[in-house]
Amino acid sequence: MASIQLSDVSFGYGEHVLFSGLSIEFARGKVTSIIGPNGCGKSSLLKLVSGICKPWEGTVRVLGHDVAALSSKGRARLLSLLAQEHAAPPMSVRQLVTCGRYPHHGMLAAMDAADYEAVERALAACGLSNLAERPAAELSGGQRQRAFIAMVLAQDTPVVLFDEPTSFLDVSACYDVMELMRSLKEEHGKTVVAVIHDIDLALRYSDEVCVMRDGKLLAQGTPQEAEVLAAVEDAFDVRVELLHGELGNSYALWRR
C-alpha cells in the first residue's frame, strides 16, 4: 500500500517544465531513496510532496489526503521534512527538539505531559539526552543533524522526508545519520523518503530506490534489481557492481 502518490503531475519553474505527467508511488512503512544527477528534480519532488510547491497539473496525495487541500498544520501532522540547508537556531538542543511538537498544539499553547514525554523519547532515541541543554550552534555537524532528526521524531508524523541528510558530514557521521533514518522505519513504523546523493548509502540503507534523470523516473525497485542498477549506470554514466554483506545489506562499487 502506498503512503504517497503522485498522479500525472506536471510542474516547473517559470517557463521551464521539470515534470510532465510524472506518476510515482512510495510504499508505506519502507525507506525509499531518490537518487539522480544534480538538477533532475529530486528536491523539487519532495517540495511537491510536502506542499511547499503545488503542481501545475495532477495530484499529490499523502495517506489518501490531497496535499494541496490541506492546511499547513494539517500537512505538519501528516508529514515532516528535514530540508537540505538549515542553520542551527539560537536555542538549546532540547528547545530545538521541542519545536517538533508545535503542530500538535500551536506555538503559544502550553505543552502537556505527552509533549514532554515525546521530546525526551526523541532525545534518547538520537543519543542526545546528555547534550540536551547545550546550545545547538555548538554541536558538531553530525550532532546537529541528529538534533534535527530528533525534532522530526518528536513531531511524530507517519511520513518523514529528508533532503540530502548526509551532505557536508564526515564518513562516520553519514553512517550515524543513515542508521537513525533507518530506525525511524524499523523502530517507529515511519514511512521514510530521502533524497540521497551517495549511491552506496542509498543502496545500502534503502528498501527501495527511485532513479531519476531530467525530471523522469527511470526505475524504481529494490537495490538488488537489475533494472534499478541499470538505471543507476545510465543516470550517472558509471559502472556499478553490487556486493552483498553478511547481514544482507548491499554495497555498491562504481567506476567510470
Annotate each predicted stretch with a short phrase.
Residues G58-A69, R75:
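Conserved ABC transporter NBD signature motif
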